[in-house]
Regions:
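Non-catalytic terminal/accessory segments
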Residues: 1-465
Length: 465
């Protein structure tokens, strides 16, 4: 099990809110149903006309605006986008219908990875994002029927939580080994010809096929220099997740034909088997299949055959018990602590209430994603660590021993306790974790200030699941 959480294929790198899945809104469902019928009727020759339909474009525009995101290489942001479309859309639409539209290069953005290195995103212009979203809405219903029930990423009505629950079920059934496969630089290594071959089996409109090929080959701009692309589907645009699922459906079908129990979320694939020997055989044979049939390479360093509780999948792991329980992987806690540390930088001049207000969305969103956890001890420990950090901020803000003693007395300590604590010559971190600060500023104090409790949030969310 490898990833920290479901990887965001967009301008934001990793958002816990994605666990909500991709369920269609009422308006989108109506449009999608109508487009599905029309697309199926016209996919032989008129699919681009469906893409450019007013209702489809309106829905795509709403999606792009809601997702916000950074500007592309043209520098046009959300605020200017509407006026830009009013001026240029008639020409753009005419080029799309004529099969002559040329996408602009994507803007390179490097996102640091937790363990070093970077994830490369390619941010399209808002115009290209709109067109890709319109394409996605029409193509998705055409290909969705072919996707595997064991594929959970970037699909309507499916999400990371379903994948994690399925993984737990497989282990509970006795598959106590996992083949954790890491596809080496998957989004950078997608073979264009192979992907286009798969697309052409379902899409008859050559204008659509040419446009997708142009998006795949659109250059990437960094430092004012555009680099051509001969492989890969850059993360950052609405079309990339769908294209990855289309290509990796070949892997899903191969695993199904062999009778394997597996979960795939985008390029994260875990296969569950009953013995280490079986796992080693599966690892070797599937690695050959990926290389021979899909032109993809398994990262031998990051991949492994192991016990499920030794790996992590979408930020979760499992306990070793006969009836395993879901737990939050240690690396996921580390990621949260790093985000909290970043949020608490430069807080000396701010009130504690302001700091807590900025911290709460991080804590609330993180726990919303990890609400499936069935172990609470570490959640309690992280709660305590957050309060420790906030007490440390108070201690540092007070600066002088007499100020500290005065504030400790205001918080209820006796004069003797307050002065002994304030003048103990220990450091801020030691004092903020000591008994005098815990008595003066207990959990109830932070509750009154509105600090989100991870444990309380977990219990509340689990009650409504």
């Amino acid at each position: 099990m490898k990833t920290e959480g479901p990887r965001q294929v967009g301008t934001d790198k990793e958002s816990p809110a994605r666990n909500a899945g991709m369920a269609l809104s009422g308006v989108e469902a109506d449009v999608t149903t109508r487009l599905r019928t029309k697309a199926e009727l016209e996919q032989a020759s008129g699919l681009m006309d469906v893409v450019c339909e007013r209702g489809n474009l309106k829905l795509a525009y709403q999606r792009v605006i809601e997702n916000k995101g950074a500007a592309g290489v043209d520098g046009i942001g959300i605020a200017e986008f509407k006026d830009h479309l009013k001026q240029h859309w008639p020409t753009i639409k005419a080029k799309l219908l004529a099969g002559e539209f040329m996408p602009q290069p994507v803007r390179r953005v490097d996102i640091p990875k937790p363990k070093g290195g970077v994830r490369i995103l390619g941010i399209p212009t808002l115009t290209d994002r709109l067109i890709q979203q319109a394409l996605h809405q029409v193509l998705s219903p055409i290909f969705e029927a072919d996707f595997s029930a064991s594929s959970y990423g970037f699909r309507p009505g499916r999400n990371a939580h379903q994948a994690v629950k399925a993984a737990k079920r497989y282990v509970t059934e006795g598959r106590r080994f996992v083949v954790d496969m890491d596809l080496e630089k998957f989004f950078d290594r997608v073979n264009h010809d192979l992907l286009m071959e798969k697309l052409s089996k379902k899409i008859g409109d050559r204008r659509v096929l040419r446009l997708i090929r142009r998006y795949l080959e659109a250059g990437m701009m960094a430092g004012g220099i555009v680099s051509p692309r001969t492989e890969g589907t850059p993360q950052g645009g609405p079309l990339s997740p769908l294209l990855s699922n289309i290509l990796l459906t070949g892997l899903d079908r191969e695993l199904e034909s062999r009778g394997h129990a597996f979960c795939r979320y985008a390029d994260d694939c875990n296969i569950y088997v009953r013995s280490r020997q079986a796992g080693e055989r599966v690892m070797a044979s599937i690695a050959r299949f990926l290389m021979d049939k899909l032109k993809l390479t398994v990262n031998a360093v990051k991949s492994a055959v192991a016990r499920p509780w030794e790996r992590k999948f979408l930020g979760y792991s499992l306990t070793w018990h006969k009836a395993p329980r879901l737990r939050i992987a240690p690396a996921s806690y580390q990621r949260l602590e790093n985000r909290v540390r970043e949020a608490l930088k430069g807080t000396r001049g701010r009130s504690l209430s302001t700091t807590i207000a900025e911290l709460n969305p991080i804590l609330r969103g993180w726990m919303a994603y990890f609400r499936l956890t069935e172990t609470k001890k570490t959640v309690e420990e992280v709660d305590g660590w957050v309060r420790h950090k906030l007490r440390c901020i108070l201690w540092r803000q007070w600066k002088r021993p007499y100020t500290r003693a005065t504030n400790l007395m205001k918080a209820g300590l006796t004069e003797e306790q307050a002065f002994r604590s304030a003048f103990n010559q220990r450091g801020p971190w030691w004092n903020s974790g000591a008994s005098h600060m815990n008595r003066a500023f207990p959990k109830s104090f932070f509750d009154r200030l509105g600090l989100v409790s991870l444990l309380d949030t977990m219990r509340r969310l689990q009650c409504v699941q």
